[in-house]
Structures are given as structure tokens and as C-alpha cells.
Amino acid sequence: MRDMKANKNKMKFNYAGMTFEVPAECLRTTDYWGKPLETPYINIGRKEVASMSKAFVKKNYPNLLVWGSSETFANGNSVSVYVCNSNGSDLDIESKEWKEIAGFVHSLSGGKYNGWEEIYEYGDGFVTENGTKIESWAKYVHCNNSAPHGSWPSAVKCLKGLIAGEYVFGPLNMEKAIEKAKGYGYSESNISKALELI
């Protein structure tokens, strides 16, 4: 526990060569009945996993673009992390960067789904650099080597595809491609940024 520092609202701990900051309530010092725990531990959820993943990419690969989001639904939650090159192109899944990023992101998962038996199998957790246990309640953690839908890199791909005729309705001129892209949920600002790069 020597690697943890807590103040009123946040706490810090070291994991994977980095210092991470999470809400102070992630540190569990009592059980569900309020009795002090002999060995306190850190409990992270979907928001913390998304935040830690983004921090990892920004520190280790500042030249890459990263997004993170999380959702809660009946009986679970999910985290999606998106990483791409600075020009918006997909990150090569054979690259050292991708393998390291995907490995880190997946290390934060709370377990995995066993499709054969149709059950979710919780993992054993992991530990900080000084041995404090970390439990993750992020159930489904995904790492993607491309930008998320609606972002400017995704808008670049969409517009190029619309102009090149990669969609069922054939090639479109720029004006019609922009209208279609808006219909697909791309914002004016992301379309404008994409147009600068086409």
C-alpha cells in the first residue's frame, strides 16, 4: 500500500510503470457491513478503466489519438477504447504499439464471457507495483485500432468512401457525400475538419 496516496477526493497508485489517479472511494478499507478490512484493496469500474486506458496511451504514445467511453446496461457494463494514428488512419494491429496498448487495456478487464457455458467468468484481479490488489468491475472491455464513429478521422473515411462509390448507391459528388455523412451522425465541425484532409 506504500504506492498509494489518497486525498479527500482522489487517490493515486502505481501500475504498469505509471501513476494513476482515481476517485478516493475506489479504495476499499471496510467490508459491506462497515468492518475494517485486514487488507484494503482498490476497486475500479468502467469509468476508471476508460480513464486509465486513455492516460496510458497519452503518456506512452503521445503521437496517437485516443478516445474512451463506457456504458452501463442490465447485468453489466462495457468499456470501449479507440486508438488511431495522428492522421486518422487505423493503427496496424501487428505493430508493437497496438500490441502494448491492447494488452494494457485488456489487463484492466474484470473477466471474460464464456460462450460455451453462457456465463461470465470473473478474473482474479491484478496488483499495483507494491502488491495492493486491484479488482475491476469493468465486464466487457474492448480495444479498437480505429477512431470511433462520428469522429473526424471516421468522417474522413466515410466521405472518401461515399465519393469513391463504396456504398450501395454508388459514387457521390462532394455536396451529396456531405449530406449523407450528416445523415450518418457526423457533426458539422468533424465534417469540416475531415474536408481539410481530403
Language-model features and meaning:
Residues 1-3:
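Short, Lys/Arg-enriched N-terminal segments with co-localized hydrophobic residues
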Residues 5-198:
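Intrinsic low-complexity, intrinsically disordered or marginally ordered coil/linker segments
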